[in-house]
Amino acid sequence: MPFKMIAQDVNKDKLSPLNVECTHAKCDDQLHSYRQKPKNKKIILQEDFWATPAQKKGSCWACGIDLVDWPRVHNKDLSDVIYTFNMMNTELVRYVYWHTSIDQKAINHVLRKGKLQLHFAAENRLRRCVAKPENYREGYQTPKQGNIIFYAQHATACRCRKCMEYWHNIPMGIQLSDPQINYFVELIMLYATARMPQLQENGIKVPPIRNNGRLFVNGLT
């Protein structure tokens, strides 16, 4: 993934999950990227923009701003989660996932599940896809849309081990503990209920999506 500065003339609210990465920044809108920039990594910049020559760990690789109280975020304190979410909204990719429209398939899917089944599904996905210390698909194990859990993982920086490392201070080379998994499940649930306040404890019946007179249910016709 190239480190890229999004052009100033691009409306931040027109960006979608399909065209942003955790290595992208839009500093003119105060939306940054805190991903550590490897040496000699290719960077795509605007013509009038110069990246900072040396990145302080935890600062934006593009403009050098250091906004986040990282020890506070790394405490993983759910009673202080509003601060964590506010700071995540200063990073471009997280901002997009907190504000983008959720696709209808994902909406229908989670309404059918309800909170109780969603909680179970979130834990199951974390254990299968990101709990292990090594994954040959590291960085690509979480799709960008189609399920509210995917949106939540990107929004709360638990979609891959690299994001977990710099946002939550969990080294890549260790197995996630049960308390860590439980913390991420709670972040996912908080995201889901914030984005979909109509979500009920138990699932509800939702009509299948119609497209040109044909019924689409979970991608099947």
What are these regions (language model features)?
Residues 15-23, 52-59, 153-156:
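Short metal-coordination and nucleic-acid-contact micro-motifs, chiefly zinc-binding Cys/His arrays
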Residues 133-175:
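Amphipathic protein-protein interaction modules
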Residues 26, 31, 64-67:
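Cys/His-rich microdomains that often coordinate metals
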